[in-house]
């Protein structure tokens, strides 16, 4: 029974990842005044399936000087972690209901760094290693601000459990009183998932393709799927934390539709940002976090603590 539950969560995610690639190509196409994919199937709808068949039927090529074991394990680990993070997300029922589900998600997203670092190191290519080191520095840096923002959210919620956020936001979405945190959180999720304008790991002009430059066929597809699964997961987490998913026990499907629609809107915002903004320089990326986001998030965290204590309205510890 548990295996069926796992499949009912995993398969829709993989399907969403496949069609997100199509939506991205279409969106970028229209923003650049062209059509995007429109040959394979009606309106290009079969393009992701054709891409999957092409990638998984090709022979993977291993560089002669690479560490073959790590080179193979890295993309598998990346996709496994990207899918594992979905387990505690309430949609409206989580696959695994953890008391510390928010901490679990932060810990799992931190582990993604290892798959990127291994892939860059195992490729034995200076471009791949440079991309991997950039990814590690970027991810670790932006996790600092994400963790501080999460702490502020937990103070408002009174619990690390994600299901409690729906009850906290029954009357008012937290995006309204905490909009500065929401803006910094959204920017941090862009950096955490290595998306434009923070895609320094894949700087085409200097690093060709970044940490996955030596990958082809199936292993490359696994990295690609992991990246897009992480994008959808981060947006789903943003919806849970800031844009309260209304939950009615009589009609849980309404809650799911509500949740999915908000996640789709945020994901389209990711694509919109990619089409609109140029890439940041590395020093600008680090300056933004350490000199702007970190002091602001710490100050807001102290503000939330002091307001709750001064008004004697600390939420119940669930």
UniProtKB/Swiss-Prot annotation:
InterPro entries: NADH_UbQ_OxRdtase_su1/FPO, NADH_UbQ_OxRdtase_su1_CS. It catalyses: a ubiquinone + NADH + 5 H(+)(in) = a ubiquinol + NAD(+) + 4 H(+)(out). The chain crosses the membrane at residues 2-22, 69-89, 102-122, 146-166, 171-191, 222-242, 253-273, 294-314. Its EC number is 7.1.1.2. GO terms for biological process: mitochondrial electron transport, NADH to ubiquinone; mitochondrial respiratory chain complex I assembly. Keywords: Electron transport, Membrane, Mitochondrion, Mitochondrion inner membrane, NAD, Respiratory chain, Translocase, Transmembrane, Transmembrane helix, Transport, Ubiquinone. GO terms for cellular component: mitochondrial inner membrane; respiratory chain complex I. It is a multi-pass membrane protein. One of its GO terms (molecular function) is NADH dehydrogenase (ubiquinone) activity. The keyword Electron transport applies. Its main location: mitochondrion. The keyword Plastid does not apply. Core subunit of the mitochondrial membrane respiratory chain NADH dehydrogenase (Complex I) that is believed to belong to the minimal assembly required for catalysis. Complex I functions in the transfer of electrons from NADH to the respiratory chain. The immediate electron acceptor for the enzyme is believed to be ubiquinone. Belongs to the complex I subunit 1 family. This is NADH-ubiquinone oxidoreductase chain 1. It comes from Loxodonta africana. The gene is MT-ND1.
């Amino acid at each position: 029974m548990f295996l069926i539950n796992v499949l009912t969560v995993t398969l829709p995610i993989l399907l969403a990842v496949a069609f997100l690639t199509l939506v991205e190509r279409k969106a970028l196409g229209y923003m650049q005044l062209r059509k995007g994919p429109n040959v394979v199937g009606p309106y290009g709808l079969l393009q992701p399936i054709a891409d999957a068949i092409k990638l998984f039927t090709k022979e993977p090529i291993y560089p002669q000087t690479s560490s073959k074991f790590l080179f193979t394990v890295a993309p598998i680990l990346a996709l496994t972690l990207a899918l594992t993070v979905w387990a505690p997300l309430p949609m409206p029922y989580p696959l695994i209901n953890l008391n510390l589900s928010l901490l679990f998600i932060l810990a799992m997203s931190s582990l993604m760094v290892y798959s990127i670092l291994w892939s860059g190191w195992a490729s034995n290519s200076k471009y791949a290693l440079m991309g991997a080191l950039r990814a590690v520095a970027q991810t670790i840096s932006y996790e600092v601000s994400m963790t501080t923002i999460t702490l502020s959210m937990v103070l408002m919620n009174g619990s690390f459990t994600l299901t409690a956020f729906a009850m906290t936001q029954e009357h008012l979405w937290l995006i309204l009183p905490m909009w500065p945190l929401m803006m910094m959180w959204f920017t941090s999720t862009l950096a955490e998932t290595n998306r434009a304008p923070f895609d320094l790991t894949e700087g085409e002009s200097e690093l060709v393709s970044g940490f996955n430059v030596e990958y082809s066929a199936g292993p490359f597809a696994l990295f690609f799927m992991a990246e897009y699964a992480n994008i959808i997961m981060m947006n789903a987490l943003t919806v849970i934390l800031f844009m309260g998913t209304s939950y009615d026990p009589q009609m849980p499907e309404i809650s799911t539709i509500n949740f999915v629609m908000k996640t789709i809107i945020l994901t389209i915002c990711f694509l919109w940002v990619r089409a609109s903004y140029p890439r940041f320089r590395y020093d600008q990326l680090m300056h933004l976090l350490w000199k702007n986001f970190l002091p602001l998030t710490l100050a807001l965290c102290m503000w939330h603590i002091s307001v709750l204590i001064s008004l004697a309205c600390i939420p119940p510890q669930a």
